[in-house]
Amino acid sequence: MQQRRPVRRALLSVSDKAGIIEFAQALSARGVELLSTGGTARLLAEKGLPVTEVSDYTGFPEMMDGRVKTLHPKVHGGILGRRGQDDAIMEQHHIAPIDMVVVNLYPFAETVAREGCSLEDAVENIDIGGPTMVRSAAKNHKDVAIVVKSSDYDAIIKEMDANEGSLTLDTRFDLAIKAFEHTAAYDSMIANYFGSMVPAYHGESKEAAGRFPRTLNLNFIKKQDMRYGENSHQQAAFYIEENVKEASVATAQQVQGKALSYNNIADTDAALECVKEFNEPACVIVKHANPCGVAVSTTILDAYDRAYKTDPTSAFGGIIAFNRELDAETAQAIISRQFVEVIIAPSATEDALKITAAKQNVRVLTCGQWAQRVPGLDFKRVNGGLLVQDRDLGMVSEAELRVVSKRQPTEQELRDALFCWKVAKFVKSNAIVYAKENMTIGIGAGQMSRVYSAKIAGIKAADEGLEVKGSAMASDAFFPFRDGIDAAAAVGVSCVIQPGGSIRDDEVIAAADEHGIAMIFTDMRHFRH
């Protein structure tokens, strides 16, 4: 597929003008005639480039506040005309061939994301002429190059220089695929935006816009192929969203180590999202998507030491996340103590990276600092469908807690309860977390019965020689029976935090009172499956 087509005439019309001046200058320097519209044409003219306004080229002015610019036979005939087949009809109607179209579309996503965006604003940012030109050029990729991404500008100029001003069919075909992906994503955004309004239009909701659209169109960009998926017989790849506004695994920069695996990414996401819950210097160690050690302290070194003590056995080969910059002292403590798959932090000092570089297999990611969590959607694939829900960003404050036991918690118990409640949110259900003095001392995860999660948390603490007496226990959901409270009391738990809501709440509260345990209700559940 090496059939070449020279680029003699290009039409440039972009909303995102990053790099467009330099690209236009490079095209013009290579003898390419430039056509352009509106703001793009004015910008190029201001830079001294010879550019023809599309309205002058067609003999037809822009109208309706710019709604009609390029929807003209001289434009689309020049793009869609098949070289060697439509030449006579093009000549008859004075239609010149357009060999390259450089277009990106009105910023619809950015517009509707702005607070207070009206329906009228959204409508005016639906591009019509742009997608039409993009699709026309992509359809006729045998003769025309369509450029929708500024990241392709340099490569296009290099190829033109290597091919006497021409582009190969391979390149034009690849650009066409990107163009169709671009317009598909654009139409999906518009469909999702208007689809979310359907319930309101039909009187099914009092909200101005329903939370979920009638049809859901998703657009993700492949970031990397994986060696394999969750298991070696499964193929896999990692896709990311565009314009992610929150520090995440998807946007993190890998500064050291071999390529991330499928399981690395899943586990690192779990660790990072957990450590984001804490304002104090914090460390989270994750194994198989479950926290196995969490602590907060005055420094991340001390937080790491305390998190590691929870379960050194499980920490081997784990993922470590911090909410502060990784420093050399902490990096040295990790490298000298354990095997670790991934370390992720907002940033890392040069000295820390020199230390981790001694272990080439250790992957180090920096994700940038975060200010607040960004609402969004969570997805879970089921056979034949997709479950969609809001991200679980819920968290209770001290003022929202309800003490339901006879005994009030002490200040330390209250701090420990709130700490382990944050951790329990990220442990697979049924989740039980024991904590004392801002560190986890036992975690029971993923058991089918809640009482066994409570027992396992106690066993883990005993195995590591950690003192449970006087600790707090968090449960991600209510206790259906009193047995979980009895199990906690047997190992010395003195305070329990849980959502409440069981039909046997009275029995559970009575059990707490019998054991002298302070019990706190959050009225919020944190199932995690």
Swiss-Prot record:
**Key words of the record:** Hydrolase, Multifunctional enzyme, Purine biosynthesis, Transferase
One GO biological process term is: 'de novo' IMP biosynthetic process
Q: Which GO terms describe its molecular function?
A: IMP cyclohydrolase activity; phosphoribosylaminoimidazolecarboxamide formyltransferase activity
**What CDD domains does its record include?**
IMPCH
Q: Which Gene3D superfamilies match?
A: 3.40.140.20, Methylglyoxal synthase-like domain (3.40.50.1380)
Q: In which pathway does it act?
A: Purine metabolism; IMP biosynthesis via de novo pathway; 5-formamido-1-(5-phospho-D-ribosyl)imidazole-4-carboxamide from 5-amino-1-(5-phospho-D-ribosyl)imidazole-4-carboxamide (10-formyl THF route): step 1/1; Purine metabolism; IMP biosynthesis via de novo pathway; IMP from 5-formamido-1-(5-phospho-D-ribosyl)imidazole-4-carboxamide: step 1/1
What reaction does this enzyme carry out catalytically? (6R)-10-formyltetrahydrofolate + 5-amino-1-(5-phospho-beta-D-ribosyl)imidazole-4-carboxamide = 5-formamido-1-(5-phospho-D-ribosyl)imidazole-4-carboxamide + (6S)-5,6,7,8-tetrahydrofolate; IMP + H2O = 5-formamido-1-(5-phospho-D-ribosyl)imidazole-4-carboxamide
Q: What does the UniProt entry state concerning the protein's domains?
A: The IMP cyclohydrolase activity resides in the N-terminal region.
Read off the HAMAP family from this record.
PurH
Q: Provide the protein name.
A: Bifunctional purine biosynthesis protein PurH
Q: Which organism is it from?
A: Salmonella paratyphi A (strain AKU_12601)
Report which gene this protein is encoded by.
purH
